[in-house]
Amino acid sequence: VLEIFPSEYIHIGGDEAVYTRWEKCPDCQALMKRLGLKKTSELQGYLTNVVAEMMKKKGRTLIGWDEIIQRGKVNEQVVALSWHNPKDTLRATNTGHKAILTPASHMYLDFPEMSIPGEIQAATWCPPISLEKCYSMPVNDYSETSTTIGVQACYWSDQFIHGNALQEFVPLNENRSENYAEYLLFPRLMAVSEVGWIKQSKRNWEDFRTRVGSHFARLDNKGCHYRLPQPRIVKEDKNADGSVTFTLACDVPGADIRYTTNGRYPNVHSTKYTGPVTLANREDLRAITVVSGTRYSLPLYFAPDYSAYKAYGQHVFGWEPLRVQPKPANWRFEVTGKVSGNGTYELTVIPTRGDNPVRLGTMKLWKRKELMAETKADKTVKAGQQPVTYRFTLDQFEAGTPFHIELEGYAPQGNNTTGMIFLRKVE
């Protein structure tokens, strides 16, 4: 490995190690006793020391995820990639190690910028990371003794593995893979650059947002498939008659805003924004940034308010009459990111409108094509009645892996029914 890679740093990974085999291994247990270790996880620190000493003899420095300095004492100075929490860099400084800031909450660019309709397929095990959130990443230690040496943005290719929507289709020559990567990386990579070069006290989001706009023409000139920002709400006024007046702004110089006021998705031929717009219902406004006939943003969009159902967890699915069949059929919906780890979950089905009852059958949880949990049932639920809840347990969670649920649901008496489904982790 050292012959192939002449770099100063050698990365050994070291994150999310599983210690169950070590707990059962007599040799590992004997080693723990000989070294006086109390926790099996401390064996990782022992192994890190062995490799770090090997690297030192070869004139190299060990680098790995922050677990390498959290699982037992490491004697040689190493570099820890802090991906859990920005404050973890303090641990590196206090224990004689170096650190690189790369928290998943701000620097994992395989997450989408938003979770609005039409957003690109991307990682979902953490919330979206907007351009502003990326730019606002906190840096906790600017002291003279700080050993934080920089920032790192991570871009994982899991989504290429998990679905065929991103695979190249040669006859079309779409260059999907590069376009996909550029869409997620730009303009957020510009934010990463400033986080690395400018002290947090001198960062100014409004100033940065304005300056980024001047770079879109450069990206266009380079053929970069960057993500266009949606129109921005500058002002929202509530009028005496209950209507709402919006004032919008565009962050892309030379671009237009096109909008609709009926809740439908706008296109490049929709009404051009020239001044404040008044609507009876704020949720009916949709607006897009238009650069050309083929380059436009996702819509400015008001997400539904599910706060009244907070006790049931996160919204994962909704049905309307056209989706409901008179005979048994499976409703399939993604729960990647909503399923956040091993444990027990409850899936709650709540009809909200309609005269007809819904018949519910078996629920199945899938990890890719592998069945993880199955709950059999034969229940009927109707608007105004108690919701139906399925309980299941997951013990083979895998971060970054897609999960989906199939639920048998139908309405033999007619499809006049509308409802929602929520998922929560209970233990």
Residue spans of the language-model regions?
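Active-site neighborhood of glycoside hydrolase catalytic domains
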Residues: 1-78, 83-96
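Flexible, acidic glycine-rich loops studded with aromatic residues
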Residues: 62-67, 74-78, 84-245
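Short, compositionally stereotyped local motifs that mark structural "simplifiers"
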Residues: 209-316
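Beta-strand signatures of extracellular beta-sandwich domains
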Residues: 256-260, 361-366, 420-422
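Extracellular Ig-like/FN3 beta-sandwich strand-entry sites
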Residues: 280-284, 342-344, 400-402
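Extracellular carbohydrate recognition and processing domains
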Residues: 308-339, 372-393
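Short beta-strand-plus-loop segments that form exposed binding edges in beta-rich domains
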Residues: 348-355, 407-414
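Short coil-to-beta strand junction motifs in C2/discoidin
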Residues: 355-361, 415-420
